Amino acid sequence: MPPAAVMIDTTPDFDFSPAHAAAAASAKGDSGDRTLLLAPPSIASREDRLTSLFSVYDRSSTDLQMLDRLAAGLVSLPAKTYDLILVLTDPDGSRRSEVSPLLSNREIWGKVVPALKAGGTLRSEDGSLGQGNSIEEKEAILAGLVLGDDGYTKPDYAEQEVVPLRFGAKKVNADGSVPLSFGKKAAAAPAPAPAPAPVSKGPAGVGFIDFSDDLDLDAEDDDDVIDEDTLLTEADLKRPIQQPPECAPQPGKKRRACKDCTCGLAERIAAEDKARREKAEKGLATLKLKSEDLSELDFTVQGKTGSCNSCYLGDAFRCADCPYIGLPAFKPGEQVKILNNTAQI
């Protein structure tokens, strides 16, 4: 009888690698939350601290990474894997000063945030992440996190659905023109209300939004014209116009209205100038004298006559036989001689 075959199991009894832990969890059907622990460099030398951590967090669903190695790009994190990322600062915050410079690096946030699941949380062990540190808070917000009561949370953006919008068709006349309505519709007799349509019940827990009433765009209703006379009441019309300070006349200067005057000063000044001009034109109208108001002006000098005793000094020569006829009046003391019936002055 041949000897029975002997099978040797070569798998390790204790394997704490992350790949083995993930495979074991999937084999067991474990769907628990995954946690990432981010530790400062000095915590690697404290074995008791690491042991106490893994006594609290399940090693099969917890990963440990060093912040300095993550900042140097020596390790990478899987995307959308962790439900909780915990920064180890000790419960009393004794390692806070060691962690803060590393969390001020934007490259670390660019690697940590994508590793969070939607709705995942990022916080520190002492609960002071982003509290009183504007640099950490700014970097967390710029990375897309939202500050909450239990640290920073990655928003869970649900899948967006496209909702088609249907607009009501405009009414068109027979000739192809669109009717316009500039007034309110006349009140028509109320039509009997239609019977309400049966409402179909949807699945439990699912809500439906009816946009038919909100988006019922009627072109005729939107074309109503507002009467601008109804915008002001009687009290508004009787209220005095408030004159701006820049329109008030300055000492020693004439009032001048602005180019775009809206307070009424330009119209008031134009009316005053027109009234002043009409008054001046009325006062400077043409003076009309009557016949009794007119008198002949005599420029002759009485008592100073010529040799003919007909013309006075300053008088024109009018006698038909006068040798000086047609000549201007002589000046006082001027001597006139006649030569060949021609006056020699």
From Swiss-Prot:
A Pfam family the protein falls into: CIAPIN1
Motif Cx2C motif 1 positions after renumbering to this chain: 308-311
Keyword 4Fe-4S: yes
Keywords noted in UniProt: 2Fe-2S, 4Fe-4S, Cytoplasm, Iron, Iron-sulfur, Metal-binding, Mitochondrion
Location of the motif Cx2C motif 2: 319-322
Broad class of the protein's primary localization: cytoplasm
Region of interest: Fe-S binding site A: 247-263
Residues reported in the UniProt entry to bind [4Fe-4S] cluster: C308, C311, C319, C322
GO terms (BP aspect): iron-sulfur cluster assembly
An example Gene Ontology CC term for this record: mitochondrial intermembrane space
Region annotated Linker, chain positions: 164-237
Domain of life of the source: Eukaryota
Keyword Secreted (UniProt): no
Segments of this protein annotated with the region N-terminal SAM-like domain: 29-163
Subcellular location: Cytoplasm; Mitochondrion intermembrane space
The protein's assembly and partners: Monomer. Interacts with TAH18. Interacts with MIA40.
UniProt note: domains: The C-terminal domain binds 2 Fe-S clusters but is otherwise mostly in an intrinsically disordered conformation. The N-terminal domain has structural similarity with S-adenosyl-L-methionine-dependent methyltransferases, but does not bind S-adenosyl-L-methionine. It is required for correct assembly of the 2 Fe-S clusters.
Family named by the database record: Belongs to the anamorsin family.
Listed name of the protein: Fe-S cluster assembly protein DRE2
Organism: Podospora anserina (strain S / ATCC MYA-4624 / DSM 980 / FGSC 10383) (Pleurage anserina)
